[in-house]
Amino acid sequence: MVGQRANGYHELHSLVCLTEFGDQIHLSPGAEFSFQVIGPYAAGIPVDESNLVVQAAKCMAQTHSKSLDCQIILEKNLPMASGIGGGSSDAAAVMRALSQYWSVPLPNVDELMALGADIPVCMNKGLTLMQGAGEDVTQLSTAPNWGLVLVNPNVGVSTPAVFNALDSKQNPPMQNVAENCVDIAWLGDQRNDLEPSAKAMVPEVATVVAAISEIPQCQVARMSGSGATCFGLFTDIKRANLAADHLQQAHPNWWVVATKMV
């Protein structure tokens, strides 16, 4: 985090990537609109207009004067409110699906920001630099062939509380990002400004980061976003799979997934 605007929005300077593993959106033609949530993390997910998927679908329909003649099923595989952009990426996926279904363009950045500040960056694959409040996104590289392990201790973290607990909201940005974003050693020197306050509030986050870091072949271990999900970066998916197996056996109550960037 590099600052805060007068309207309360935080100024960010973040590297973001999408992964192969995630929630799934299933869209099919229908006489009228319907929305259903299934999957291991479906419990408690609203199916009314408070859901960002429904808002995104209606935004697309209104923008292009279309009737919502489709059925959408959200397969919820990611923990809720876990710092990995599940809701925002779901909304982005629905918009991409409807763009293809109706053969219409995607909304502009202002329309995306009106739905959610993290949605614009979820439209890009590869490594993307997100700046401003989320409206300034620049794709820097195609996805490196690295392996990732995502770990969540199944403990919630309050995003507003994490932001409010920050010692400083004026921090230096990353330097020479475009030249170094695929350099694992450089990535290991970068930080998540939200991580210290999250660890202080939820000690399980520190436990997870430490457990990932202790795996000999882990290159980088950090918290993702505002937590509580953390990630380990490995040179390939084989090493990530072995690490995920080890972590799941050692901590059966944690959510652990090995995946790749896309």
Name each region found by the language model.
Residues 1-82, 99-100, 104-105, 143-145, ...:
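ATP-binding N-lobe of GHMP and related small-molecule kinases
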Residues 25-27, 53, 87, 151, ...:
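Residue-level signal for inorganic ion chemistry
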Residues 35, 124-220, 235-241, 245-253, ...:
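Conserved, helical-rich catalytic subdomain that frames metal- and/or nucleotide-binding sites
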Residues 53, 82-107, 121, 125:
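DPxDG-like acidic metal-binding loop motif
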Residues 62-73, 96-115, 236-249:
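Phosphate-handling active-site elements
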Residues 82-90, 219-228:
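Short glycine/threonine-rich catalytic loop with a Thr-x-Gly-x-Asp
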Residues 231-233:
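Short hydrophobic/aromatic beta-strand micro-patches
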